[in-house]
UniProtKB/Swiss-Prot annotation:
GO biological process: DNA recombination; DNA repair
InterPro entries: DNA_helicase_Holl-junc_RuvA_I, Hlx-hairpin-Hlx_DNA-bd_motif, NA-bd_OB-fold, RuvA, RuvA_2-like, RuvA_C, RuvA_C_sf
Cellular compartments per GO CC: cytoplasm; Holliday junction helicase complex; Holliday junction resolvase complex
Complex and partners: Homotetramer. Forms an RuvA(8)-RuvB(12)-Holliday junction (HJ) complex. HJ DNA is sandwiched between 2 RuvA tetramers; dsDNA enters through RuvA and exits via RuvB. An RuvB hexamer assembles on each DNA strand where it exits the tetramer. Each RuvB hexamer is contacted by two RuvA subunits (via domain III) on 2 adjacent RuvB subunits; this complex drives branch migration. In the full resolvosome a probable DNA-RuvA(4)-RuvB(12)-RuvC(2) complex forms which resolves the HJ.
Lineage: superkingdom: Bacteria
Listed name of the protein: Holliday junction branch migration complex subunit RuvA
Entries under Gene3D superfamilies matching the protein: 5' to 3' exonuclease, C-terminal subdomain, DNA helicase RuvA subunit, C-terminal domain, Nucleic acid-binding proteins
One GO MF term attached to the UniProt entry: four-way junction helicase activity
Cystine residue pairs: none
Spans annotated as Domain III: 151-201
Domain I: annotated span: 1-61
Location relative to the cell: Cytoplasm
Length: 201
């Protein structure tokens, strides 16, 4: 079993990246391929999914992301594509928090996750994620930190909706989202300005 692939990013598409190592290009499906840049050296933590008619590699920037992905695969009704879409939010901590707080409304935002699947995720995983990212679990009940985080997420959500109103496609928005998530405590207007700076380059 290959734990990770370390090499040069050769190609980036909306669904996957190609990372070259030793003259071999590995096609790796990732939650958000646009966080990677062509020619950069990267370490991708991999998960092998084998079916009768396919062999696929799924890759993650951290071991914690990979661990959460494998946990999600244990949930009835969640396959690799569904788990990848959930992690595409770019914030594993928010996913874990939603599970621990039984926040079905958050989980149903993801493609392919209805109320029944959201409930199944909570039933199967609540209380079983401390080994994925322990410090996230420790901080879940810090009320002040949670309020600040929720306010920041609201501002970011409003900014993303504003970009859609301005006519930007989901592909373009997804490309700048990782840069926006690096910022903290910004207002909706500030997030929009940051996004436009990236989009208009």
């Amino acid at each position: 079993m290959i734990e990770f692939v370390k090499g040069t990013i050769d190609y980036v598409s909306p669904q996957y990246i190609v990372i070259e190592n030793g003259g071999i290009g590995y096609q790796v499906f990732t939650p958000n391929p646009f966080i990677y840049k062509v020619s950069n050296q990267e370490t991708i933590f991999t998960y092998h999914h084998i079916k009768e008619d396919a062999f696929s590699l799924y890759g993650f920037s951290t071991r914690e992301e990979k661990a959460l992905f494998t946990k999600l695969l244990n949930v009835t009704g969640i396959g690799p594509k569904g788990a990848l879409a959930i992690l595409g939010s770019g914030d594993p901590g928010a996913v874990i928090e939603a599970i621990e707080q039984e926040d079905e409304a958050f989980l149903v935002k993801f493609p392919g996750v209805g109320k029944k699947t959201a409930r199944q995720i909570i039933l199967d995983l609540k209380g079983k994620l401390a080994d994925v990212v322990p410090e996230m679990i420790d901080n879940l009940f810090n009320h002040e930190a949670r309020i600040e985080k929720q306010e920041a997420e609201t501002a970011l959500d409003e900014a993303l909706e504003a970009l859609r109103v301005l006519g930007y496609a989901e592909k373009e928005i997804k490309k700048v989202l990782p840069h926006l998530k690096e910022e903290t405590a910004l207002s909706t207007d500030q997030y929009v300005k940051k996004a436009l700076q990236k989009l208009l380059k």
